[in-house]
From Swiss-Prot:
A Pfam family recorded for this sequence: Glyco_transf_22
Subcellular location field: Endoplasmic reticulum membrane
Molecular-function annotations in GO: alpha-1,2-mannosyltransferase activity; mannosyltransferase activity
Topology class, membrane: Multi-pass membrane protein
Main location: endoplasmic reticulum
Assigned EC number: 2.4.1.-
Chain segments annotated as transmembrane: 53-73, 81-101, 164-184, 190-210, 234-254, 292-312, 323-343, 348-368, 372-392
Biological function: Mannosyltransferase involved in glycosylphosphatidylinositol-anchor biosynthesis. Transfers the third alpha-1,2-mannose to Man2-GlcN-acyl-PI during GPI precursor assembly.
Annotated pathway: Glycolipid biosynthesis; glycosylphosphatidylinositol-anchor biosynthesis
Domain of life: Eukaryota
Protein name: GPI mannosyltransferase 3
Record's miscellaneous remark: The protozoan parasite evades the immune response of mammalian hosts and digestion in the gut of the insect vector by means of its coat proteins tethered to the cell surface via GPI-anchors. GPI10 is essential for growth of mammalian stage bloodstream form, while procyclic form (insect stage parasites) are viable but grow slower, suggesting that inhibition of GPI synthesis may be an effective chemotherapy against African trypanosomiasis.
Keyword tRNA processing included in the entry's annotation: no
C-alpha cells in the first residue's frame, strides 16, 4: 500500500475519530480512557469489573501512554487529554485498513498468476483469431471500475458505516480485530502465537476465534517434520509462548490490582462458563447470524455470501479458494461461537466486518467484469453507507458528548452530578481539569454471596423511582404514601439501597428532560437551580430510559 494512500487513510480516520459526536455503549469510555485516566492522574471511578479482576490492564495501559507523556511534558490540557486517545484510535483503524488492503492484494496476486496461466493455455490450444478475442476481453476487464480486490476492499472498509461508527470508539473489540487480521497473515508459528496471545490478553474470546488456525500450523509442521516431531514442536512452542504471555499479563495486572489474578480466566469464567453476562441483556441465538451480520456489513453482505458461488462457477477464482473460504470459515466460526453466549452486542463480532468486506470485494471484482448492474449496485451500497455514517455518527444519540463539549469549553465546575442511567456520560478523561468532582447514579454490581446473583443497585432504584431517588439522595425525604402498603414497600426498597442525604447539592446537574420535569418543582426550583441549556440527544429514541433531549441545570448563587 503506497505511503500517500496510508497518509490519506489516517487523515480520514482521524477526522472521523475527532468529529463523530454520538455514543454507542459506556464501555467506549469506562473500560478504556477512564481506566487509563485513573492510572495516570489517580482520579476517577473504576467500573465494577475492575473490582472482581475481570479485565486485564493491558489495553487501558496502551491508552494511558499518551496520557502519561502529556503529563510528563506538562502539556496535559483539557483538549490534549481529550484528543490524544483519538489519535491512537485513528492509528488502530488505519492499520486495520492497511491489513484489509494487504489481504486483498494477496488475492490479487493469486488471481493474476492464475489468469496468466489460463491465458497461456488458451493461446497454446486455440486458434490465433480466438486468442486475439481473449486478449481484447482481458484488456476490457482491466479498464473496469472494480479491477483490484485490494483497492475495492479498501474502499469498502473506508465507507462501511459500522467500521466508522464503532471503529472510532476505544473498544477492546477494535484492537482485537486488528490483532486477528495480523494473525491471519502470519505463516510462521511463533509470530502467530504471540499475536494470538496478545489478542487473547485483551479479549480472551480471541483465543477461541483463532483456535482453528492452530490446525493449519499443525498440518504445516507435520508435513515438514513428520507427525510426531511436528506435533511435539507445536505443543512445546505453544506452551513456552503461553507461559510467557500469561506471565507477562499477570505481572502487569499485579502492578495494577496489587494481587495476583489471572484476568483472562476470570473473564471467561464470569461471562462464558457462568454466563452471568446475561443479566446485561439477552438475545436469541440467531441474533448475530441474522440482523447483526446484515446490519454491520451492510448491503455488501449480499456479495459476501455469494463468494462460494463465484468460486464454484469461475475457474480462475479457484486459485483463491483457500484464503476466501478460510476467511468465510473464521467469520462463521466467530458468529457461531458468540451465538452460544446469551449476552450479545454488535461490537463483539467487529472482527467479522473486515473479513466479510474482503470477501465481498473479491466477488465484486469478478462480477463487475461482466455485469454493469453489479457496479451500479456497489455505488448505491457505498452511498447508503455514507448516509448511515452521517446519521449514526452525527445525529443519533449525540447528547452526552455535546454535554461534555459544553463542559470542556465552559468555566470550571466544582461539583457536577449526572442524574441518568448507568454510565450515560464519560468521566474525567473528557473534561480534564474542568470538574473537581463528578457524581453519578451508582450501578456497581455486587454479587450476592448466597445466590451468586447481582444485588439491586442504585441505578435500578433510579429507573423505578426517579423523583423519589433524587429527593432521598439529596434531601433525605420522599413522597411515598406510607399508609399505602405498596407505596410503603417501595419506600423500604429505596431506603435499603440508597443512603439518605448521601450526596451534597451539586453546582450543576445533567439529566434527561423527562427526569427534569419530574423533579423541577419539588427539587430543582426549590433549591435554586435554573435551566442552563437543552441538548438534542436524538430525533427519536429506541433505547429504554432515554429521551429526545438532555438538559443541564446550574445552581444560582446569590
Amino acid at each position: 500500500m503506497p505511503w500517500w494512500l496510508i497518509s490519506l487513510t489516517f487523515i480520514y480516520r482521524l477526522f472521523l475519530c475527532a468529529t463523530i459526536r454520538t455514543v454507542e455503549a459506556p464501555d467506549e469510555w469506562w473500560q478504556s480512557t477512564e481506566v487509563a485516566y485513573n492510572m495516570v492522574f489517580g482520579k476517577g471511578h473504576l467500573p465494577w469489573e475492575w473490582r472482581y479482576g475481570l479485565r486485564s490492564v493491558l489495553f487501558p495501559a496502551v491508552v494511558a501512554l499518551p496520557f502519561y507523556l502529556l503529563k510528563l511534558l506538562g502539556r496535559d490540557t483539557t483538549w490534549a487529554v481529550w484528543f490524544a486517545p483519538r489519535v491512537l484510535q485513528a492509528l488502530v483503524l488505519t492499520l486495520i485498513d492497511v491489513s484489509v488492503f494487504c489481504m486483498g492484494a494477496t488475492l490479487d496476486e493469486l488471481l493474476a498468476k492464475r489468469e496468466l496461466e489460463l491465458a497461456e493455455e488458451t493461446r497454446q490450444s486455440k486458434t490465433k483469431g480466438f486468442s486475439y478475442f481473449c486478449e481484447v476481453s482481458v484488456s476490457r476487464s482491466r479498464r473496469g471500475i472494480c479491477n483490484s480486490i485490494s483497492y475495492t476492499a479498501l474502499l469498502l472498509s473506508l465507507s462501511n458505516w459500522y467500521m466508522a461508527y464503532c471503529g472510532v470508539r476505544l473498544y477492546g473489540n477494535v484492537i482485537e480485530a486488528l490483532l486477528v487480521l495480523l494473525t491471519l497473515q502470519q505463516r510462521r508459528y511463533v509470530p502467530f502465537l504471540l499475536l494470538t496471545g496478545l489478542a487473547s490478553a485483551i479479549r480472551v474470546t480471541s483465543a477461541v476465534v483463532l483456535s482453528p488456525l492452530v490446525f493449519r500450523h499443525l498440518a504445516n509442521a507435520t508435513r515438514e517434520h513428520g507427525f510426531i516431531r511436528g506435533l511435539f514442536r507445536i505443543v512445546l512452542t505453544g506452551l513456552i509462548v503461553l507461559v510467557a504471555v500469561l506471565g507477562g499479563v499477570m505481572v502487569l495486572d499485579y502492578c495494577f490490582y496489587g494481587r495476583w489474578v489471572l484476568t483472562p480466566l476470570a473473564f471467561f469464567r464470569f461471562n462464558v462458563l457462568h454466563n452471568l453476562s446475561r443479566f446485561f441483556g439477552e438475545h436469541p441465538w440467531y441474533f448475530y447470524v441474522g440482523p447483526v451480520l446484515v446490519g454491520i456489513v451492510g448491503p455488501h453482505v449480499l456479495f459476501t455470501i455469494a463468494a462460494p458461488l463465484v468460486l464454484w462457477r469461475d475457474t480462475a477464482s479457484r486459485a483463491v479458494s483457500r484464503p476466501v473460504l478460510g476467511m468465510l470459515g473464521i467469520g462463521a466460526w466467530t458468529l457461531g461461537f458468540y451465538s452460544l453466549i446469551d449476552h450479545k452486542e454488535m461490537r463483539f463480532v467487529f472482527v467479522v466486518i473486515p473479513l466479510s468486506l474482503i470477501t465481498a470485494a473479491f466477488v465484486l471484482v469478478r462480477w463487475s467484469r461482466t455485469s454493469a448492474v453489479v457496479v451500479k449496485m456497489n455505488r448505491l451500497f457505498v452511498l447508503f453507507n455514507i448516509v448511515m455514517i452521517y446519521l449514526m455518527g452525527y445525529v443519533y444519540r449525540r447528547g452526552p458528548l455535546d454535554v461534555m463539549a459544553e463542559v470542556r469549553d465552559g468555566p470550571r465546575i466544582n461539583r457536577l452530578d449526572v442524574i441518568a442511567t448507568c454510565y450515560t456520560v464519560p468521566g474525567y478523561s473528557y473534561m480534564h481539569k474542568k470538574v473537581n468532582h463528578l457524581g453519578f447514579v451508582d450501578c456497581s454490581i455486587d454479587l450476592d454471596e448466597k445466590t451468586g446473583l447481582p444485588k439491586v443497585t442504585e441505578d435500578i432504584m433510579f429507573r423505578r423511582y426517579p423523583k423519589e431517588y433524587v429527593l432521598w439522595r439529596y434531601d433525605g425525604k420522599h413522597s411515598f404514601n406510607m399508609s399505602d402498603l405498596e407505596e410503603s414497600r417501595k419506600a423500604s426498597e429505596l431506603q435499603s439501597v440508597v443512603m439518605p442525604k448521601s450526596a451534597p447539592h451539586p453546582d450543576a446537574m445533567v439529566m434527561t428532560r423527562a427526569v427534569a420535569k419530574e423533579i423541577e418543582e419539588p427539587f430543582l426550583k426549590r433549591h435554586g437551580y435554573r435551566l442552563y441549556r437543552t441538548f438534542l440527544h436524538s430525533p427519536l429514541t429506541l433505547a429504554p430510559y432515554e429521551d429526545i433531549y438532555i438538559q443541564m441545570w446550574v445552581k444560582v448563587t446569590k
